[in-house]
Amino acid sequence: MRQTKTGILLANLGTPDAPTPEAVKRYLKQFLSDRRVVDTSRLLWWPLLRGVILPLRSPRVAKLYASVWMEDGSPLMVYSRQQQQALAQRLPDTPVALGMSYGSPSLESAVDELLAEHVDHIVVLPLYPQFSCSTVGAVWDELARILARKRSIPGISFIRDYADNHDYINALANSVRASFAKHGEPDLLLLSYHGIPQRYADEGDDYPQRCRTTTRELASALGMAPEKVMMTFQSRFGREPWLMPYTDETLKMLGEKGVGHIQVMCPGFAADCLETLEEIAEQNREVFLGAGGKKYEYIPALNATPEHIEMMANLVAAYR
């Protein structure tokens, strides 16, 4: 029997190549052109995207990226590369490639990299702990487009999500415990997930249920009372209703109600990025403190910590 050679494809969202309006515009154009992300009629969406959104948002978003940019690139790229390298070191006989849905390195370049290693089985791990059609679904779509152009197709194992994976929950819990030990236990632990339009959930996307699963399992692992843990949704875009409650509005309300100390974690982000380091760690900190809150800490993503890499290794092992 022929022995199978397996490769691993780590997939994430993507990032601009530079914190400049031009690079951000290229990235946003690709990102916001995906029907999995915005499913508005193209006749309505294209003029709005090209004539209004890209010209106005690109310079502003570029400044935000510049505020968190690291010496070796954007935080998401730096931490994603560290994850790839650490997982490859943990699994020395298994090729590990990194691909992004938008920007570089592309998912296609990652697939080609693995095929050049003569793998005949690819384990695809989208680094989105909670499934959503707008994230994991986009990886699935692009992978199908890539393989449709190949004469020979490798075996594919696709990990839908890992919202209640034991190692993932334990890694989150240990990160929370470390933050509590450093800063003191807060009045409230707020778990902020990236939002999606409410309509997507109404049409069958089980993302909110998967977020609730992670929240429930994490609270249980920490032994925290339900009233000490709150789940919210961030980063809404456009005018239609998104999943609620909204993170920024909740933080304002909590500050006004006299809640003094909050710690915030974003369990849906496998690596820190603009949304966590700028929106959550900075903007929403000001919202809470400005509303009367006294103390606010952001708990970093798992990034390339040894516990996170071990979780990834154990997760893909079941599919090899």
Swiss-Prot record:
PROSITE patterns attached to this UniProt entry: FERROCHELATASE
Pfam family, one: Ferrochelatase
Pathway it works in: Porphyrin-containing compound metabolism; protoheme biosynthesis; protoheme from protoporphyrin-IX: step 1/1
CDD domains: Ferrochelatase_C, Ferrochelatase_N
Coiled coil regions in record: none
Gene Ontology BP, a term: heme biosynthetic process
Keyword Cytoplasm carried by entry: yes
Lyase among keywords: yes
Lineage top rank: taxon: Bacteria
Gene Ontology CC entries for this record: cytoplasm
Keywords: Cytoplasm, Heme biosynthesis, Iron, Lyase, Metal-binding, Porphyrin biosynthesis
EC number: 4.98.1.1
Residues binding Fe cation: H194, E275
Catalysed reactions listed for this entry: heme b + 2 H(+) = protoporphyrin IX + Fe(2+)
Location in or out of the cell: Cytoplasm
GO molecular function, a single term: metal ion binding
Function text: Catalyzes the ferrous insertion into protoporphyrin IX.
Family membership noted in the UniProt record: Belongs to the ferrochelatase family.
PANTHER family registered for this protein in UniProt: FERROCHELATASE, FERROCHELATASE, MITOCHONDRIAL
NCBIfam families: hemH
Subunit description: Monomer.
Name recorded for this polypeptide: Ferrochelatase
